[in-house]
Structure formats: structure tokens, C-alpha cells
Regions:
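Cleavable Sec-type N-terminal signal peptides
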Residues: 2-20, 25, 29, 365, ...
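Short, intrinsically disordered terminal tails adjacent to the first/last structured region
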Residues: 2-17, 22-69, 579-607
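Primarily membrane-embedded glycan-assembly and transfer machineries that use lipid-linked glycans
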Residues: 58-336, 340-343, 368-517, 580-592
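Central hydrophobic cores of alpha-helical transmembrane segments
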Residues: 302-308, 348-353, 500-508, 537-549
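Extended hydrophobic/aromatic segments used for targeting, binding, or gating
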Residues: 307, 318, 511-551
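Alpha-helical transmembrane segments of multi-pass membrane proteins
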Residues: 325-335, 359-362, 502, 521-529, ...
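Transmembrane helices and adjacent periplasmic/lumenal helix-loop junctions
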Residues: 348-372, 510-522
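Aromatic-enriched
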Residues: 530-607
Length: 607
């Protein structure tokens, strides 16, 4: 009875948070897992069953009756990825038109003309932007939960004290052997997370099962096997490929929340995955509510539209996962709080976002550059920077000891995390983006030319070439980063702290880091800079539309993501250029224009 009530509550939450499309998902979450004998059956002969009674064959004409019928035509209202992308881009173009029209009216002194209708339309497009990221309720072709992601982050967080960063695939294989599937483990390859980070055979794992089991108590090992059994069945024929991904990479600070929730929610099940997957949508809704509160309707609509349209960070990658967007929510909300002059709490959230995924630290670097410059000039920190610093220090002071308690380890935890981070930094991926990807790219060294299926890791040669290319031009990478950093400092040194935070993150993360494509939702704060230059929002939407244009190019994925990364770098430099223009040429903020016009009219009346 209790479980029935739990399922009903989960269904209600899904309907409220995710919309009508979640009704079917709630039904799925309360249903039993479908039988998958091909995935779960151990390597044992099947039981002998008595032969079934012979059934008389149907006449041939009846057998062919259905074959002759053509398949039904899909409804014009049926959802496909192509239709969804077209709808998102169509809404984006409509928003561009509304914004430009509104700004023309403001510049001509007619800001009140159609104002209510324009605001309603812009608000509608903003809401559809948020909804559009969820593929308008279709999620992963009707499946809300990203099971692959839950395997990595639910298992990785729940058993982090035993697995750490190097033993996820090794221990999964050891557990699978004890589940009666030794032959299947022996016949496939897994990624070696501990040593080479390359894909290879499982011989060493099979020969040394105690290497994994010595880290578990007997009770925890049985729980682990039960959870692995669930994911083997749930992933089905995708399970072998899941063992070739890149493991669990949550930071020690993210692991605080991840580990506590994964252990509290109970064994891996449809219900537990569904409930954990609800957390990201709730945070995303909170994030966009914060944007509307801090920056107003137009900027909310631009940010939401970018989120929906941007191809690299689409729902496909991390939608329906376990807390993969918390870093984004805390970082964006931190900037919103800086805008509303809640500097202490804003600094705490910026520090939290950085701790949860590392690269968001560049959003905090902007205010830090300001603080350093002003201290150099005035020998004192401003009040806003003092509050930001205090908030960040308090958050860090809480997160560091908590991470060691949850991980049941000491300072060696951070050494292991640093090694894991360095390992991934030296592992090029076909969906990497950023300046390093651009510098290491060569048209003759693409995956199309270097992929070798005769190797255990078909991309090994391609990776080696990428690393060599980067090492030859490392000096250029450093020099360009210094130029970008100078541009950020020069642009924001006398601006409010929120401007420095937004610009530094949007510019420096593509320049200084090499991230997988799905993190590029971090570009959302580019919309905030419409407060200073309204074209910043137009360029951001055009950037998102441009990523779809790049996908139409007849090239391989590594080339496509290189071009998307280059476009993101260009957007950052365009922001610096625009903000460096003389103040007299600066466009009025969309949020401030009506107020300025009203003030001007009042002045004329007084005269």
C-alpha cells in the first residue's frame, strides 16, 4: 500500500513539473520492468519444457493479408526530432522578430504601442523555450529517464567509498560474473579507468576479482550486485557499450548530495530512477524563475530560447539524468543574486556551482579580477566584493569537510580526483569543444581519416594525433587565453560584479577549458549582457541556430563540434568588442527603455 501511494505521488509530481507528457512516464514508472531474457539470462542451458501441441497453419491468403497493407502515415502532429528542431528554430526566429520590432518602437518613442501583446508573445515564447528543451514532453522518444546516465552517477555516487574513480567498470564486470554471466564478460571489452583510459579486454579483471571485492563489506557487495543486475536488465543490449564510456566523474563536492540521495532512495529501480530524475527539471524551472526575477521578461525569453535551440546541450545528452544540471542552476542563480545585490548569497552559490563541476569557477574569476584591480587602485576591497568573498569562503568551508565525511576518506580523495581530472584532460573526445579542440584540429587528422576498427579502441590513433597537435601549439593556446582574459578585465573592471561574472564565464570557459558538448548550456548568462548591449541576446540566439546549421554539414562529429566550439569562441570575442565600444554608442537596456522614455516625457511636460 505504501509503495502504491509513493507511485501516485511520483506521478503527481511528474505531471506538475514536466507537463502532460509525464503522465505516460508515471505509468511506466509504476509498471514492472519488461522481461529481457536475452540480457538477464545467465550462461546456463535453458530448462527443458514439454513440446507444445502442433497448431494448424493459417491459410496463406490470411497470412499475407496484413503484409499487403501499407504502413500507416504518421500524423502531422506526431513528434519527431526533425519536427521538434524546426519548431524550436521557428520560435527562435519569431522571438528575434519581436525583439527587433520592439526595440525599433522604443527607439522611435512608441514603446507603448502593442506593448501588452508583445510582452504576452515574448513570455509565451520563453515558456515554450523551457518546454522545448524537454522536446515538448517527448523526452527521449517518450522515455523520460536517461538510464545510461543513472547507471554511471547513481552507482558511482552510491558506492563511491568502494569504487572511487577507477573501479566502476571493473567491479561491474566482477559482479556480473557472480551473476552467472562470465562468458559474456570474457567476450567483450571495457574501458580501463585505472591505467590507460583506453578500451581493452577483460582478462585481467576476470583473473583478479578480489581486487574489487576487497573494498566492499559483504552486505554492500550484495547490494551492489543487486543494483548491477537491475541495470544489466534495464540497459539490455546497450549494457556492453555502457562499459566503454568514461566512468563516474562527479567532484568530491557534488558527491555529497549525490551519495546521500542515492543511498537514501533505496535499491536501483524504475521508481528510484524516476524520482531522482525529477530533481533536474525542478532546478531548471527554479533557474529560469530566477532569471525572470532578476533580469526581466525579455532576457528570460532569450535565455530559455537559447537553452531549447542550442544543439550541443540538447536533452539527448543529459536530460532525465541524476543531478547533471545542478551546477548550472546554482551558477546562474548566483549571478541573478549578484544582480539583485544579494552579494553574499550570490558568492556562496557561485562557489557551489564551481565546486560541483569545476569549470564554472570562471564565473567567479570575473568578480575576482575586479576585486584585484580595485584593491590595486584603492588599497581596499569594495563592500560588494567583500560580501562575495565571504559567501564563497563560507560555502567552501562547509563543502570541503562534508565531502571527506561522505566519501569516508581524507585528503587523498582530492589527489585521486586531481588524477582523474588530468586523465580526462589528456583524453580527446569527438564531442569536445573549445579553443584547445580548435587548436588541435587538422582536416587531415579527423576521425574520418584516423579511426581504426582493428584496434581495441578505434579512436586511439586519432587521440594521439590530437594530443601531439595541441602540444606543438600549446604556446598559442596560452597566448590566446591571455588575450581573452585581458579583454574580460578591460571590459568589466568598472562594471557591476554580475557583469564581470557573466562575461568571464561565457568568454573564458570556451577559451581555457575543453569540455564535452553537453556542458555548453553554461552560455546562458550571455543573455544577461543584454542589459549592457541588447545585441548580445540576438547573437546568442543566432549562435544556437548556427549549431543546427553545422549539423547539416557533410562531416564527422569531431569536425562538427570543432566548428561549434569556434562559433562559441567568436561569440565571446564579439561580446568583448561590443562592450568596449564608447558609452555614447551603447544601446539602452530593454528593461530600462520604457522607464527612460517615461522620465523623458515627464520632463517635457514639466518644461
Amino acid at each position: 500500500m505504501i509503495h502504491a501511494h509513493t507511485r501516485l505521488i511520483a506521478a503527481a509530481i511528474a505531471c506538475l513539473v514536466l507537463g502532460p507528457g509525464a503522465i505516460a512516464l508515471a505509468d511506466e514508472a509504476t509498471a514492472a520492468v519488461p522481461d529481457q531474457p536475452s540480457a538477464l539470462a545467465p550462461d546456463l542451458p535453458a530448462a527443458v519444457t514439454p513440446p507444445a501441441a502442433p497448431v494448424a497453419p493459417k491459410p496463406l491468403s490470411r497470412q499475407l493479408a496484413n503484409v499487403r497493407k501499407p504502413p500507416p502515415e504518421p500524423s502531422i502532429f506526431s513528434y519527431t526530432e526533425a519536427k521538434g528542431n524546426a519548431l524550436k528554430i521557428g520560435f527562435a526566429v519569431m522571438l528575434l522578430g519581436l525583439l527587433v520590432w520592439g526595440w525599433q518602437l522604443e527607439d522611435s518613442g512608441q514603446s507603448r504601442k502593442w506593448r501588452r501583446a508583445r510582452r504576452v508573445a515574448i513570455g509565451f515564447l520563453g515558456v515554450m523555450g523551457v518546454y522545448g528543451w524537454f522536446n515538448y514532453g517527448k523526452f527521449h522518444n517518450g522515455n523520460f529517464v536517461h538510464v545510461w546516465e543513472h547507471y554511471h552517477y547513481y552507482i558511482g555516487a552510491k558506492y563511491f567509498p568502494e569504487l572511487r574513480y577507477a573501479r566502476l567498470y571493473e567491479c561491474s564486470a566482477t559482479a556480473e560474473v557472480e551473476l552467472g554471466r562470465r562468458a559474456r564478460v570474457a567476450s567483450r571489452s571495457i574501458r580501463d579507468l585505472a591505467q590507460t583510459n583506453l578500451i581493452g579486454p577483460t582478462d585481467d579483471v576476470l583473473a583478479n576479482p578480489e581486487r574489487c571485492k576487497e573494498h566492499f563489506s559483504e552486505a554492500r557487495w550484495q547490494d551492489f550486485k543487486q543494483d548491477i543486475s537491475f541495470f544489466i536488465g534495464r540497459l539490455g543490449n546497450r549494457w556492453p557499450d555502457s562499459q566503454k564510456d568514461h566512468g563516474y566523474n562527479g567532484t568530491p563536492w557534488w558527491n555529497i548530495t549525490g551519495s546521500i540521495l542515492a543511498n537514501l532512495i533505496g535499491p536501483a529501480s524504475e521508481r528510484s530512477m524516476f524520482l531522482l530524475a525529477l530533481l533536474d527539471p525542478a532546478l531548471i524551472l527554479l533557474m529560469f524563475a530566477g532569471i525572470w526575477w532578476a533580469f526581466g521578461l525579455e532576457i528570460f525569453a532569450v535565455a530559455a530560447t537559447f537553452f531549447a535551440v542550442n544543439f550541443p546541450s540538447r536533452y539527448y545528452w543529459n536530460g532525465g539524468a541524476f543531478l547533471r544540471y545542478d551546477y548550472l542552476a546554482w551558477t546562474v542563480l548566483g549571478i541573478c543574486l549578484l544582480k539583485k545585490k544579494r552579494h553574499g548569497l550570490g558568492g556562496a552559490l557561485l562557489a557551489t556551482g564551481a565546486a560541483f563541476r569545476l569549470f564554472p569557477v570562471f564565473f567567479a574569476v570575473g568578480p575576482a579580477l575586479q576585486a584585484g584591480w580595485r584593491f590595486f587602485k584603492e588599497r581596499v576591497l569594495s563592500a560588494e566584493h567583500r560580501k562575495i568573498l565571504v559567501g564563497a569562503v563560507v560555502a567552501t568551508a562547509l563543502l570541503v569537510p562534508a565531502s571527506m565525511v561522505v566519501a569516508k576518506g581524507g585528503l587523498e580523495l582530492y589527489s585521486e580526483f586531481a588524477q582523474n581530472t588530468e586523465k580526462h584532460a589528456q583524453t580527446p573526445l569527438t564531442n569536445h569543444m573549445g579553443l584547445r579542440t580548435v587548436i588541435s584540429w587538422r582536416p587531415w587528422d579527423s576521425a574520418k581519416h584516423l579511426k581504426d576498427n582493428s584496434l581495441n579502441d578505434p579512436f586511439q590513433t586519432w587521440k594521439e594525433h590530437r594530443i601531439d597537435n595541441y602540444e606543438r601549439l600549446r604556446w598559442l593556446f596560452i597566448a590566446l587565453n591571455l588575450v581573452f582574459l585581458w579583454g574580460v578585465w578591460r571590459t568589466t573592471r568598472d562594471e557591476p560584479a554580475w557583469v564581470a561574472a557573466a562575461l568571464c564565464g561565457v568568454v573564458m570557459i570556451p577559451a581555457a577549458t575543453e569540455l564535452t558538448c553537453y556542458y555548453y548550456a553554461f552560455m546562458i548568462p550571455g543573455a544577461f549582457l543584454m542589459e549592457k548591449r541588447r545585441e548580445a541576446g540576438l547573437w546568442l540566439i543566432l549562435l544556437a541556430i548556427g549549431t543546427h546549421a553545422i549539423t547539416r554539414m557533410p562531416i564527422w562529429d569531431d569536425d562538427k563540434y570543432m566548428w561549434m566550439g569556434l562559433a562559441s569562441l567568436a561569440y565571446g570575442w564579439m561580446l568583448i568588442w561590443a562592450l568596449l565600444q564608447p558609452k555614447a554608442a551603447e544601446a539602452r537596456s530593454p528593461a530600462l527603455a520604457p522607464a527612460l522614455e517615461t522620465a523623458g516625457a515627464s520632463g517635457r511636460r514639466r518644461r
